[in-house]
From Swiss-Prot:
Residues 1-26, 62-111 are annotated as: Disordered. Residues 36-124, 174-214 are stromal. The gene is PAM68. Pfam families: DUF3464. This is Protein PAM68, chloroplastic.
């Protein structure tokens, strides 16, 4: 008679343990499902945020990296890799990737900021437009002297005057570029003489470097 309640207790204990095991398995399966869902959703949001941040930061990085847009690019130090036998194709792929990265960096350095471009255009409008306008005004002036006032003006005088003013307008293109402030965060002076002294050697150096590469 004493063995019957013992067996009953053991069977009840086994049933309760089997129920606990089943509940634990269900909980673990739910946790794994939640983890899979979060893993599939979180990287997408992170990648979208990263893309937006990169698209916003790229033009600012190009501006602050090379605000002038001129001059030789800084030299880069390339890491030396030890050659390994049987990995020649991998090394070639790595070299091609490095070359592509270098080309992209050079393009970013060559970008002139929009603020600096607007300064150059406004300065060229003054240095080119003013002498060109004055040179064009001399044509009706000489015509009035000759026809209206009957003044005998030599033919070489209009040619010299037009040559001087048109040449000044042509030189104003270069002066408008050089006399502008190439720093996006700093406005230049009115005439831009100090900026021209600083920027002129850099302008010629970049010009000769580009001609040597060709």
């Amino acid at each position: 008679m004493a063995s019957v309640p013992c067996s009953f207790k053991l069977s009840a204990h086994r049933r309760s343990s089997s129920k606990l095991d089943g509940n634990n398995k269900q909980c673990s399966s739910l946790v794994e499902r939640l983890r899979d869902k979060t893993k599939s959703q979180v990287p997408k949001s992170i990648t979208c945020i990263n893309r937006l941040e990169i698209s916003r930061i790229a033009p600012l990085h190009a501006t602050m990296n090379s605000p002038k847009g001129f001059g030789p690019p800084p030299k880069k130090t390339k890491k030396s890799k030890k050659p390994k036998p049987g990995n020649q194709s991998d090394e070639d792929d790595d070299d091609e990737d490095e070359d592509d990265d270098d080309e992209e960096d050079e393009r970013e350095r060559g970008v002139i900021p929009e603020i600096v471009t607007n300064r150059m255009i406004s300065r060229m409008g003054f240095t080119v437009g003013l002498p060109l306008f004055i040179g064009l005004l001399f044509f009706p002036f000489f015509y009035y002297l000759k026809v209206g006032l009957k003044v005998d003006v030599p033919t070489w005088v209009p040619f010299i005057v037009s040559f001087v003013f048109f040449g000044t307008a042509l030189a104003g293109v270069s002066y408008g570029i050089v006399s502008s402030s190439w720093d996006p965060l700093r406005e230049g002076s009115l005439l831009g003489w100090n900026e021209a002294k600083k920027n002129w050697p850099v302008f010629w150096q970049s010009f000769w470097n580009s001609s040597d590469k060709r």
